[in-house]
From Swiss-Prot:
Mitochondrial membrane ATP synthase (F(1)F(0) ATP synthase or Complex V) produces ATP from ADP in the presence of a proton gradient across the membrane which is generated by electron transport complexes of the respiratory chain. F-type ATP synthases consist of two structural domains, F(1) - containing the extramembraneous catalytic core, and F(0) - containing the membrane proton channel, linked together by a central stalk and a peripheral stalk. The lineage of its organism: Eukaryota, Fungi, Dikarya, Ascomycota, Saccharomycotina. The gene is ATP4. Keywords: ATP synthesis, CF(0), Hydrogen ion transport, Ion transport, Membrane, Mitochondrion, Mitochondrion inner membrane, Transit peptide, Transmembrane, Transmembrane helix, Transport. It comes from the Eukaryota. It comes from Yarrowia lipolytica (strain CLIB 122 / E 150). It is found in: Mitochondrion inner membrane. This is ATP synthase subunit 4, mitochondrial.
């Protein structure tokens, strides 16, 4: 059993190892340059420069140098691994902004077109205003005529009321005068009838009228 476990661990270890060619290719890809020759030149120049600086004591390797180297390697790895993701995110963000700007532009264009359509509908506003003004003038004229007619009707009603009152007054005055005249005549007749001379005169006149009737017969 221990040997089987050791064999399994060894097989897993070898299966997880990266191919040296692939690793070398990834290192070359991380070095700036357009082709393999230029990248190799950059790498060789960097190595020779480092050896020269260290051998001539122009640069002394210390803890800070190690930390700086590790940090630089970390930055290179992060840039290598995170570069595509950041590029994809940046492309997506730019595309999103482009879509937002295009949508805003389309909305603004539609709003401008709608405004132009509304204005084009009002191209006959002058004629419409003139027609409305003419109608309003006719309406004012009709209202003035109606008001004048109403005033005339009111005046006629008031005049009729005054005339009716005057006629009623005259009728009442005439009736009083006739009543007074009748009462005066009746009173005079009654007074005359009570007078003996008047009675004698009436009797004599009546006898004469009868005699005339007999004479004609």
């Amino acid at each position: 059993m221990p040997f089987a476990r050791v064999g399994a661990l060894s097989a897993r270890h070898y299966s997880n190892q990266v191919d040296p060619k692939v690793k070398a290719t990834s290192i070359l890809d991380s070095i700036p340059g357009n082709n393999v020759l230029s990248k190799t030149g950059v790498l060789a120049t960097g190595v020779l420069g480092s050896i020269y600086a260290i051998s001539n004591e122009l640069y002394i390797v210390n803890d800070e140098s190690i930390v700086l180297g590790v940090f630089a390697a970390f930055v290179v790895v992060v840039a290598k691994l995170g570069g595509p993701g950041y590029t994809s995110w940046a492309d997506g963000y730019i595309e999103n902004m482009r879509n937002i700007l295009n949508t805003t532009r389309d909305k603004h264009t539609d709003a401008v077109k709608e405004r132009i359509g509304d204005v084009s509908k009002l191209k006959d506003v002058v004629k419409t205003t003139q027609d409305l003004f003419a109608v309003s003038k006719d309406t004012v004229k009709l209202e003035a005529e109606v008001f004048e007619t109403k005033q005339q009707v009111v005046l006629a009603a008031e005049a009729k009321s005054v005339l009716d009152s005057w006629v009623r007054y005259e009728n009442s005055v005439r009736q009083r005068e006739q009543k007074l005249l009748t009462e005066t005549v009746i009173s005079k007749i009654e007074k005359d009838l009570k007078d003996p001379k008047f009675q004698q005169k009436i009797l004599q006149q009546s006898v004469e009228d009868i005699e005339k009737l007999f004479a004609k017969a």
